[in-house]
Amino acid sequence: MTRPKYVASCSGGKDSVATLLLAAQHNEPLDEAVFSEVMFDKDTSGEVPEHRDFIYDRLKPFCEKKLGIKFTILHADKTYDDVFHHVITRGPHKGEVRGFAWAGMCVVNRDCKIPPVRKYNAMLSPDTVSYVGIAEDEPKRLARLDGVKKVSLLAKYGMTEVDAYKLCQEHGLLSPIYTHCRRNGCWFCPNASDSELLHMVTKHPDMFDRLIEWEKEDNIFHRRLTRRETPSEVKARLLSKSQTGFSSPRSKYEMEV
């Protein structure tokens, strides 16, 4: 009788990377790590550039060469470009271009991140075990796991979010995103913090200006990037704020380490 396949969901964030490290440390079975990459358009990643580079240049080679496991990167058929330029087909805004995603309603997650994961999961054997990066100090999220087909190694070995941060740091596998934000997400996320947005405005202005170009297109229904501001308004406010002493907050994990 062969054992089931063991797969780790991996965003490249501290909890999912710590899960990979724990599996190696404790000789837990692990065959593959899976990352679903949202794309801005066909050629540009939706990941913050530094995080995208971390995935491709550090984490993927580490998994394949050091851990000896497959690292699979999934992509949806749709990109954020497709989501933004979707033409509304019914209702009072029929015929208008949808525009930016709404804060709190993650159409990007629905259309660009989840579909390839579902397609991948459909090809797996029913007895496949999935490792998920949920820390011991996240009881509400842990309560949703069955502990059989979906397992948290962080909880099994008593690791909190701070512990996960430290473990990644010790192994040189902490994503650089934690220097300016507390989580990893798309660089055009409507729920992004000011520090995340400022990072894109100042470090990757050409990319952020793509959003401003879209904002100025004709027949756009939703022009706001965040709950209150368009991309051009976000840029103007943050640049003005940075000139008067804006500082990026330290990660709560860094402060507790």
Where are these regions (language model features)?
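Nucleotide-activated chemistry modules centered on ATP-dependent adenylation/adenylyltransferase
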Residues: M1-V257
